[in-house]
Swiss-Prot record:
Bound cofactor: record note: The D1/D2 heterodimer binds P680, chlorophylls that are the primary electron donor of PSII, and subsequent electron acceptors. It shares a non-heme iron and each subunit binds pheophytin, quinone, additional chlorophylls, carotenoids and lipids. D1 provides most of the ligands for the Mn4-Ca-O5 cluster of the oxygen-evolving complex (OEC). There is also a Cl(-1) ion associated with D1 and D2, which is required for oxygen evolution. The PSII complex binds additional chlorophylls, carotenoids and specific lipids.
NCBIfam families associated with the record: psbA (TIGR01151)
Protein known as: Photosystem II protein D1
Compartments where located: Plastid, Chloroplast thylakoid membrane
Lineage: Eukaryota, Viridiplantae, Streptophyta, Embryophyta, Tracheophyta
Residues spanning the signal sequence: none
EC number(s) per entry: 1.10.3.9
Segments crossing the lipid bilayer: 29-46, 118-133, 142-156, 197-218, 274-288
Annotated site (Tyrosine radical intermediate): 161
Encoding gene, per UniProt annotation: psbA
Primary location recorded for the protein, binned into one broad class: plastid
Database matches in PANTHER family: PHOTOSYSTEM II PROTEIN D1
Superkingdom of source: Eukaryota
Annotated positions binding chlorophyll a PD1: 198
Oligomeric form and interacting partners: PSII is composed of 1 copy each of membrane proteins PsbA, PsbB, PsbC, PsbD, PsbE, PsbF, PsbH, PsbI, PsbJ, PsbK, PsbL, PsbM, PsbT, PsbX, PsbY, PsbZ, Psb30/Ycf12, at least 3 peripheral proteins of the oxygen-evolving complex and a large number of cofactors. It forms dimeric complexes.
Length: 353
């Protein structure tokens, strides 16, 4: 008997690289989306840290009145932020090489655009990487679908809203108090609290946290004990065990008697789909609401909508909100314009002279 041995061709360097990138045996999965995600998120994070610590003041309103945002220029963790790119730049793509000098680039808020654009690309690739890993492992794609909600929200406040308003200076500052300022100004200019899509988002976030707490407490309260009374019930679980770890029948019975029978899920798959879908759909709607308000399709306006038989206004809470909106609007960008847009839009009376 004769055995013929053939020499196996060695795999090319590119082939080995492809196998390493797409291998699910790596401690952290990279994937083709990861090839773009890693450098973009590293860039965004590095520039954010450096700018948060040391960036000079930025002329956000384009009126030669720089606003300080970094720690070395007098801020703390709460008040510090990456100041958005100047209104003088508008929506122009503003990389370092477009400025006459690095000082000019910093003065006009170039780091904000750099961070935001790299960050959005990075989180979009993170979402793609979630789908890619799910695909390689033979899983369904819903993890990436769920993550699309925060990606949509980030895109709405960092990209869609500035596009609608005509300038990156209207984007959300990258800091704690800057975020609050963005929220207050957004309410003043768009009446977001009276927008039904924002209401759906609030229901999604608060409802999601409520349902999460209810589910976690029900499961924890109906564990199948595998240990003695002297040991923690948590110690009875083995990773990968085939047996159920809690009694869904007991949990269903408890909750059905606490509220009513049909308020409780008796199907674990339906339950977990609901837990995922509720907050995700709510945040989708909020992102959609921000994106519509970006183009000034604002919240409901019920100002002075209730009057008596004599035509006199009977104030409602909508009028109280409107008064607060006017107060917030006259306080922000106080040197950029003399009157809020609502008042400035009124046609001036003609004079005979």
């Amino acid at each position: 008997m004769t055995a013929i041995l053939e020499r196996r061709e060695s795999e090319s360097l590119w082939g080995r690289f492809c196998n390493w990138i797409t291998s699910t045996e790596n401690r952290l999965y990279i994937g083709w989306f990861g090839v773009l995600m890693i450098p973009t998120l590293l860039t965004a994070t590095s520039v954010f840290i450096i700018a948060f610590i040391a960036a000079p003041p930025v002329d956000i309103d384009g009126i030669r009145e720089p606003v300080s945002g970094s720690l070395l220029y007098g801020n703390n963790i709460i008040s510090g932020a990456i100041i958005p790119t100047s209104a003088a730049i508008g929506l122009h793509f503003y990389p370092i090489w477009e400025a006459a000098s690095v000082d000019e680039w910093l003065y006009n808020g170039g780091p904000y655009e750099l961070i935001v654009l790299h960050f959005l690309l990075g989180v979009a690739c993170y979402m793609g990487r979630e789908w890619e890993l799910s695909f390689r492992l033979g899983m369904r794609p819903w993890i990436a679908v769920a993550y699309s909600a925060p990606v949509a929200a980030a895109a709405a406040v960092f990209l869609i809203y500035p596009i609608g308003q005509g300038s990156f200076s209207d984007g959300m500052p990258l800091g704690i108090s800057g975020t609050f300022n963005f929220m207050i100004v957004f309410q003043a200019e768009h009446n977001i609290l009276m927008h039904p899509f924002h209401m759906l988002g609030v229901a999604g976030v608060f409802g999601g946290s409520l349902f999460s707490a209810m589910h976690g407490s029900l499961v924890t309260s109906s564990l199948i004990r595998e240990t003695t009374e002297n040991e923690s019930a948590n110690a009875g679980y083995r990773f990968g065990q085939e047996e159920e770890t809690y009694n869904i029948v007991a949990a269903h019975g408890y909750f059905g008697r606490l509220i009513f029978q049909y308020a409780s899920f008796n199907n674990s798959r339906s339950l977990h789909f609901f837990l995922a879908a509720w907050p995700v759909v709510g945040i989708w709607f909020t992102a959609l609401g921000i994106s519509t308000m970006a183009f000034n399709l604002n919240g409901f306006n019920f100002n002075q909508s209730v009057v008596d038989s004599q035509g006199r206004v009977i104030n409602t809470w909508a009028d109280i909100i409107n008064r607060a909106n006017l107060g917030m609007e006259v306080m922000h960008e106080r040197n950029a314009h003399n009157f809020p847009l609502d008042l400035a839009a009124v046609e001036a009376p003609s004079t005979n002279g």
